[in-house]
């Protein structure tokens, strides 16, 4: 099977699998929910937009940012609801409304400059050794700063040296920031951060579910599980795209 055919089948698997899982999970949760049915349906729709965005992103398509805009706005609202109910999510809510939403427009403009259009793929690039060092140091410093700030104000954080609710809020938050920045500027290394986002987000929503969180927690566990699978394929595709771009220099 050639690479293009594999990518088409893999994208179809992610889209169909996510859609089926969402329909079944939402139907079960909807039937058993006494309240919050509107939020449940909104979460399901946002998750579907998110999987369309991440599949498009993995394949280097600029339509990523249309689906992404709907996804991040809805997810920010869901995180805010989870935090209001006593769980984690404050940092992610702030991130999505003040950073992720406007970055969809930034990414659209940047990808157009790097050759992506309705049918073509973006010209990907890679970090060099020095850039890797700076990105790594900035990531560590940002993680510490965000932890200290959110631990100070997050009402869900219990007392103690290490507040796990805050850790699960901060790690996907910082990975999201760096992943989006590298994505908008078309760097292959974005996928290492997206893999981190997906792992930590699954952990966060699983913890919310185990402590009696919102009925939409299961939807987000499914969503980020599919995202995680897609992230590894995205890394593979973007590695090849960056090699192709280097060869054309």
Pin down the residues of each PLM region.
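Alpha-helical transmembrane segments and their membrane-interface exit regions
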Residues: 47-55, 74-77, 98-110, 175-178, ...
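Hydrophobic, ordered structural segments
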Residues: 70-123
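A mid-sequence, solvent-exposed acidic-amphipathic segment
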Residues: 146-189
């Amino acid at each position: 099977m050639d690479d293009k055919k594999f990518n088409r089948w893999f994208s179809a698997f992610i889209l169909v699998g996510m859609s089926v899982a969402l329909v079944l999970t939402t139907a079960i949760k909807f039937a058993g929910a006494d309240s919050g049915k509107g939020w449940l349906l909104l979460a399901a729709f946002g998750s579907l937009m998110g999987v369309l965005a991440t599949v498009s992103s993995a394949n280097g398509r600029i339509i990523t940012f249309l689906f992404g805009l709907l996804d991040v706005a809805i997810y920010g609202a869901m995180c805010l609801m989870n935090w209001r109910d006593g769980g984690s999510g404050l940092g992610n809510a702030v991130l999505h409304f003040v950073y992720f939403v406007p970055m969809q427009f930034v990414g659209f403009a940047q990808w157009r400059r790097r050759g992506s259009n309705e049918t073509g793929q973006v010209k990907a690039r890679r970090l060099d050794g020095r850039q890797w060092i700076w990105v790594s140091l900035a990531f560590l410093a940002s993680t510490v700063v965000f932890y200290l700030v959110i631990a100070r104000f997050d009402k869900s954080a219990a007392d103690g040296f290490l507040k796990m609710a805050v850790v699960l809020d901060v790690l996907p938050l910082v990975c999201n920031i760096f992943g989006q920045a590298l994505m908008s500027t078309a760097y292959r290394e974005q996928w290492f951060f997206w893999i981190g986002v997906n792992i930590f987000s699954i952990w966060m929503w699983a913890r919310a579910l185990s402590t009696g969180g919102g009925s939409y927690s299961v939807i987000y566990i499914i969503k980020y599980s599919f995202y995680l699978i897609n992230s590894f394929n995205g890394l593979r595709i973007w590695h090849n795209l960056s090699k192709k771009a280097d060869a054309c220099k």
